[in-house]
């Protein structure tokens, strides 16, 4: 018998919201009887943007901004139909991007 697996990737700019969402998903999956692997922290993506402070001159004066994208991975092994139904009804914050692969 082949094992079924649901792979969930979460992305967010705020790691606290991301961890809360991951805990909700893990808790929901465990409550419905599936075994869960994760949340596994994936490498944080860091984008750095450099801009000039002045409009026309003073090229040596620059300012840097960074944007960090935190990621988590959750595997749900042998999900039941109740697990899938509970995950579809789960309400997560708007700042979290969810990618689900079956």
UniProtKB/Swiss-Prot annotation:
Q: What is this protein called?
A: Small ribosomal subunit protein uS10
Among PROSITE patterns, the record links this protein to: RIBOSOMAL_S10
Describe its assembly.
Part of the 30S ribosomal subunit.
* Function noted in UniProt: Involved in the binding of tRNA to the ribosomes.
Going by the UniProt record, its keywords in alphabetical order are: Ribonucleoprotein, Ribosomal protein
SMART domains, A to Z: Ribosomal_S10 (SM01403)
Top-rank taxon, per record: Bacteria
Q: Name one GO molecular function term.
A: structural constituent of ribosome
The GO cellular component terms are: ribonucleoprotein complex; ribosome
Question: Which family would the database say this protein is a member of?
Answer: Belongs to the universal ribosomal protein uS10 family.
List the GO biological process terms: translation
Q: Which InterPro entries match?
A: Ribosomal_uS10, Ribosomal_uS10_CS, Ribosomal_uS10_dom, Ribosomal_uS10_dom_sf
């Amino acid at each position: 018998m082949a094992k079924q697996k649901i792979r969930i990737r979460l992305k967010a700019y705020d790691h606290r919201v991301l961890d809360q969402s991951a805990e909700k998903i893990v808790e929901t999956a465990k409550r419905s009887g599936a075994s869960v692997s994760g949340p596994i922290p994936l490498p944080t993506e860091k984008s750095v943007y450099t801009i000039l402070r002045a409009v026309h001159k003073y090229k040596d004066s620059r300012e840097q901004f960074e944007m960090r994208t935190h990621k988590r991975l959750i595997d749900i092994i042998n999900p039941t139909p109740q697990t899938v139904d509970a995950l579809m009804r789960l309400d997560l914050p708007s700042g979290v991007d969810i990618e689900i692969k079956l």
